[in-house]
């Protein structure tokens, strides 16, 4: 009750990243077992995002408590200075900054009480002997939109997921999300998700 003690378990050494290496190395041709692991994982994501956020003191999140316009602009400027400028592509800097500000406003326009994992990738998911997923490494976690983690997971470049597999996993996530919170229409959900896919791609 004093919050000074906790139970710790050994999850072993099998990560989801290692468990689906065959499909990744085959250029995105995942077998049925690997797809089932991905489905099981993506259906567990809303559990930590919604149920895990209940009662959480956001002020304990480090380095900041909430996904906001400043954090979006920080990442977008990283893209500008580390990719655009070194590439020597010609662009109008003031117009780009204006677009960045509008984009940041769009991304943060819907307020939610969900936990944004921030680094939700296969390397940060461990599997127990029964192939149940356990999520590790919460550094950078904060209050924020649930679309972010879904985009992070399904559009990580190294995974090589096919468009069909992505669509199937988005549908699985959407279905699982209904168990934890009221969900927007499919059209609205997909539209919002596309914004975060673009944002994660720029990162």
Regions found by a protein language model. Give the residues of each.
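Active-site-adjacent scaffolding segments
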Residues: 9, 65, 69, 76-79, ...
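Amphipathic, non-membrane alpha-helical segments in soluble helical-bundle scaffolds
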Residues: 35, 69, 140, 163, ...
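An alpha-helical support segment within catalytic cores of ATP-dependent transferases
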Residues: 53-65, 70-71, 75-115, 181
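Glycan-recognition and catalytic cores of secretory/periplasmic carbohydrate-active enzymes
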Residues: 54-58, 62, 66, 73, ...
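Active-site activation/catalytic loop segments of kinase-like enzymes and analogous catalytic loops
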Residues: 77-86, 146-182, 198-203
